[in-house]
Amino acid sequence: MGLPPLQTQPGTFLVALGLCCWLLATANAHNCQHQHPKAHEVVHGVRIQLADSDDDDAAGSSDAAVHSVRRRSVTAEQPLRILLVYDDSVYRLEEEKFNLINDTVLPEAVQFWEQALMVRETKGIIRLNRKCDSTQVYVKNGHTHCIDQCKATTMCGEVQVPNEHLDVCRVCNATGQNCRIDSNTQPGDGIQNADFVFYVSARQTQRCFKGLTVAYAAHCQQEAALDRPIAGHANLCPESISTKPQELQTLISTVKHEILHALGFSVSLYAFFRDDEGRPRTPRKSETGKPFLNEKLQIHQWSNETIRKVVRENWSVRGGHVNKEVDMMVTPRVVAEARAHFDCDKLEGAELEDQGGEGTALTHWEKRILENEAMTGTHTQSPVFSRITLALMEDSGWYRANYSMATPLSWGKGLGCSFAMRSCKDWIQMNHARGRSIHPFCSKVKQDPLQTECTDDRNSVALCNLIRHDYELPKSYQNFDSLQNVKSGEEGFYGGSVSLADHCPYIQEFTWRSKNIIVRGSHCRFVENNPKPEKNFALESYGHGSKCFDHSEAMWEERSCHQTREWQHWGSGCYKYTCFDGRLHILVGNYTYKCSFPGQKLSIRIAANGWLHKGAIMCPPCHELCGSHFAAQGKQCRPGEEADPLNKYPRDNLACGAESRQQRSVAIISAALLLAAGLRLGHS
């Protein structure tokens, strides 16, 4: 990759800096490769005994199932208990990766869901069913019977289920007669003190090579009483596991995401959801007790009480309007939480993803309106599990949710029906016309020189991910009639880099890469993201207690007694701050700068690392960062006032002798001549 041209000033010697060779790329998009199991791949009818039910045999009958669920209101749910079972492949991971997965990632991910979800306690031992050679089975006395024989091995994803976890093999002949227990099989010891068993492997499968797949998961067996998934699997992709500290939280979030697919957030499980009384939300076939099969998708088809298609008329796109059909999750708690989040009382529910094909569409939230919700189809920045996701799990009828475990979701919060029910083109156009912020969307094309900004929560330095694509986008994803500095007629090539967000451009974290290896990220809280001192042109400070602050429109400059250099990207940076005396104070280098009013430009002139750093930082409103701090003390931000005189602020100077200044002048002229000569040679 060639060096980008550096900005020049008259009489300035410019140095090509190593940072310019780095690629600034929007944050890693960890794509979910959830491959929902087909109907015939899932084993149903695992018999368990629920707490307070009469006996194991009753659990298989529909009457007992309804009776068990209807007693939920008078039976205390217990925290979900997940048992992890490792395949041998996990132990073959590199030591550093194994320790990370075994000691941190899986324990934290499992503990989160054990605290976030409660379930009717499973009493006694779980023995999983054996798989059958045929997709046809018979159910006799509540037990599933294979035709003639069971499979020699029962798999759950990439993992073979241990024999000690399996029940006996039950078989009938082809006509459903002569049903019996295969005398060659014995019941295993079973699984105790667990409500869900999770088989984990670490194999570099073909699915691992698709996108940036870190892990994938699904359920493999469901119990007889409530249809709740009771066993599942996850595969971790060894080559995609990063041990970098700044990527740990995203890795943990990815594993949490995959676990939730196995627990219930899956297109292959929606048809089995139940209401609070234990009644199926989707009608069942009388002869099988299962929902009707969608032959095309090879999954059980849900009813309109779970997911409903809605047509958005007059959906604004470049050059006009179209009708857009969306799939909405319309279960009661999801509807209530979605309406509360967006502040839109007429919102039908929560929109599901309509792109990405099998494994992404319908099995995730729509990226356009729930961008960093962890259950969207790709992780792009700061993923959170919101109340909306917990509401879905509770609406399955299998769990109670502990909403204190939800993380606040700022994306779209309180933005109303015009954000939640209309296109991003409408939102951008409407707010531009009213002189309002178009955030969380943006309209600044990503190009050199790169000008960064801050995310709305000020947790990260970010870029607008609006780029020129190599092809014209589909009409329904063309979101601009015109763009600054873009030739008329070419607007259809421009859109956000995240396709799942309908190519709506938005402010996004990014990473610095060198030879496709991540050097550092742009999230303020990670000390590992600090630039090296020789490359820290804006004197940033990443780590605990840091937030993002905007720079002024002018580029930052570094001067020594011999050189002056400007950096090819600027716009925002991460800095420590404090709140005292009713004011926000920003720490830069070894100095503290007081913000007297919103929009105040703090002029920075600090000598560090052999350079004089010159730039400016813009003060945000005090309440954005200090409001809650002062409120906890019974105080508040003081009203804005005139800033202190400039001589009250730190102002360093270079100490250069006359000889240094003379040498500097000569160096400038020589460098300018060499640069000019080089340019001419390059064009000859």
Curated annotation (Swiss-Prot):
Source species, domain of life? Eukaryota
Q: Which UniProt keywords apply?
A: Cell cycle, Cell division, Cytoplasm, Hydrolase, Metal-binding, Metalloprotease, Mitosis, Protease, Zinc
Q: Which cofactor does it need?
A: Zn(2+)
- List the GO biological process terms: brain development; cell adhesion; cell division; centrosome duplication; chromatin remodeling; germ cell migration; gonad development; imaginal disc development
Where on this chain does Zn(2+) bind?
Answer: H257, H261, H364
Its localization reads: Cytoplasm
Name where it mostly resides.
Answer: cytoplasm
Tell me which SUPFAM superfamilies the record gives. Answer: Metalloproteases ('zincins'), catalytic domain
Q: What class of enzyme is it?
A: hydrolase
Locate the active site. E258
Task: List the GO terms this entry assigns under cellular component, sorted alphabetically.
Answer: cytoplasm; membrane
Q: Which Gene Ontology terms cover its molecular function?
A: metal ion binding; metalloendopeptidase activity; peptidase activity
| Record has Protease as a keyword | yes
Record's keyword annotation contains Protease: yes
Family per record = Belongs to the peptidase M8 family.
Q: What does this protein do?
A: Essential for the coordination of mitotic progression, and also plays a role in cell migration.
Q: What is this protein called?
A: Leishmanolysin-like peptidase
